[in-house]
């Protein structure tokens, strides 16, 4: 609060040091210029700047200081490592969107090249396009699949129609991580059958970090290393274990743009 005028304004004249007295933010609170939300001693040029996808209906630009950004990636690398995925050497089949403008598209392709991944764009997943995707799996030694749940499920249904198990034609595959959208149990069973590899579910938010990740025992493991996760009722009171409520998440390390 002492270092960020945006939060000082939200708190107002309250002088309490109690955690529960702090206001809970929503994305509408953040619909103002980034420069008005950054902490003292930070500028857009000294931080990592990105924007959310808008899947919740309220897209916005956010920032992370370099230390927080590095810790986010350390958290991701650690969890993928549970499944013997090494970001330096493992080759990723990536089912994600990509900017359509020329410069944005080329930047993303260069990032893919440097990050050891091959991107399948998800804007057109017709049978003709999926046939081309299948050819890539026949000819490239992918180690793992990562991307949007719905796109990966659609590819699995295509394989089912062809009576093909992906592991049979791409034996280097080890695991598939799905993200961004809910994975239903029926779809997970389909993916396991048509891919022939373990299916791992993750839940995250780009402005925060991985929030929860399925561990090797098949259980959801909440990220308590970089986030403080609370389950609250409609009056913002902490609920007892096992009760349903709202996820309220605090990033523990982002000093430039606290959440």
List PLM regions with ranges:
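Short acidic/polar alpha-helix capping motifs at helix-coil junctions
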Residues: 44, 96-101, 149-155
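Short, acidic Gly/Pro/Ser/Thr-rich loop/turn segments
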Residues: 59, 100-102, 254-257
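Short, well-ordered beta-strand segments
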Residues: 93-95, 248
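Nucleotide 5′-phosphate-binding alpha/beta core
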Residues: 1-51, 56-91, 98, 134-146, ...
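Rossmann-like NAD(H)/NADP(H) cofactor-binding core
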Residues: 91-93, 201
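Alpha-helical membrane-targeting segments
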Residues: 88, 106-115
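Conserved coil-to-alpha-helix start sites within the AMP-binding
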Residues: 98-109, 127-128
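Active-site glycine/GP-rich loop and adjacent strand/helix microenvironment
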Residues: 112-259
